[in-house]
């Protein structure tokens, strides 16, 4: 058996028990091959409902390699569409309009429906599969609670909160197209406007207003100040903070390596006393212990000491032999 086929086979065997569990939990979205830790760095293979998504980040795949992948996973499920996204350096931005249209499908995770589409105007899938453990946590803990989902992207966490019976769910994201997918996800699960809300806003303006912190912005000479949605101060029972590695706006800079407190402090202050803040850091080179130390110091300085902390680890379709997954998730009980 060729070495590459052997690696795919081993990955499938390693997932057998997990996939049995996920299928029983009404889940058909998961990672099939996590190349970084399964023998082929830069290659990922995911199932999104009826779609097989293949992505390469280091080098383009040959037709033979693509055919081998398709044949191997045809034994698991009959894909209605196979999508290959070449995200290696020379091809990551080369995508014509025809490619971007793609087909739309519905995938399921833990009984919740999500819009899935392999080719679209952005690069990332609509649903980040390694965050399943976080969405699972929200499904189990959001009932009868007020929930704020920051950097909500396509609102998976917020959808889970509403499905769990949260008494209030608010999703905040700067990108209108992300929230549009979130609204589709809400419709796919028959959620009403009373159950879930969407706010298009910069993180800093929304989080600071909820936290009761004055909003400041950088304004160049001759320019008018940027407008932003006006929100009432409010604290939430459960806040979910999942920021990108780096982003800059007129209201602040997100930098998970050098300045995590800039996003953490307003999130802490928007969480009520006795509430829960779930926060993440997806930068692989930031060690867990260093990040946790920063989180604890920030909480103390903000006057919101952490009474207890627990950690969520991505599930077994994202293996991490050294026990240090890039995605770090901390649940802070305040």
Regions found by a protein language model. Name each.
Residues 235, 276-334:
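C-terminal catalytic and target-recognition region of SAM-dependent MTase-like enzymes
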Residues 38-39, 43-46, 62-129, 136:
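Non-catalytic substrate-recognition/targeting regions of SAM-dependent transferases
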Residues 144-153:
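Conserved class I S-adenosyl-L-methionine
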Residues 178, 221-266:
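Mobile active-site "lid"/loop adjacent to the S-adenosyl-L-methionine
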């Amino acid at each position: 058996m060729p070495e590459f086929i052997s690696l795919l086979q081993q990955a499938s065997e390693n997932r057998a028990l997990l996939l049995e569990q996920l299928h029983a939990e009404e889940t058909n979205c998961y990672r099939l091959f996590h190349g970084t830790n399964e023998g082929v760095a830069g290659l990922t293979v995911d199932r999104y409902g009826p779609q097989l998504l293949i992505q390469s980040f280091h080098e383009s795949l040959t037709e033979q390699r693509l055919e081998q992948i398709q044949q191997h996973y045809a034994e698991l499920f009959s894909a209605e569409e196979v999508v290959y996204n070449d995200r290696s350096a020379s091809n990551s931005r080369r995508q014509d309009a025809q490619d971007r249209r793609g087909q739309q499908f519905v995938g399921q995770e833990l009984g919740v429906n999500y819009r899935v589409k392999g080719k679209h105007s952005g690069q990332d899938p609509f649903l980040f599969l390694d965050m399943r453990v976080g969405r699972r946590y929200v499904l189990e803990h959001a009932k009868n609670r007020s929930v704020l989902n920051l950097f909500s992207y396509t609102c998976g966490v917020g959808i889970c909160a509403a499905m769990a019976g949260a008494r209030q769910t608010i999703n905040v994201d700067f990108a209108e197209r992300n929230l549009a997918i979130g609204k589709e996800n809400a419709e796919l699960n028959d959620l009403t406007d009373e159950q879930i809300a969407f706010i298009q806003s910069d993180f800093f303006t929304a989080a600071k207003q909820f936290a009761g912190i004055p909003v400041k912005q950088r304004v160049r000479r001759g320019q008018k100040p940027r407008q932003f949605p006006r929100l009432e101060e409010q604290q939430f029972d459960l806040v979910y903070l999942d920021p990108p590695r780096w982003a800059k706006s007129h209201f602040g800079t997100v930098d998970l390596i050098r300045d995590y407190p800039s996003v953490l402090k307003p999130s802490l202050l928007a969480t009520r006393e006795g509430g829960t803040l779930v926060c993440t850091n997806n930068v692989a080179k930031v060690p867990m212990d260093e990040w946790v130390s920063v989180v604890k110091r920030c909480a103390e300085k903000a006057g919101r000491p952490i009474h207890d902390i627990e950690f969520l680890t991505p599930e077994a379709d994202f293996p991490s032999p050294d026990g240090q997954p890039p995605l770090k998730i901390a649940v802070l009980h305040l």
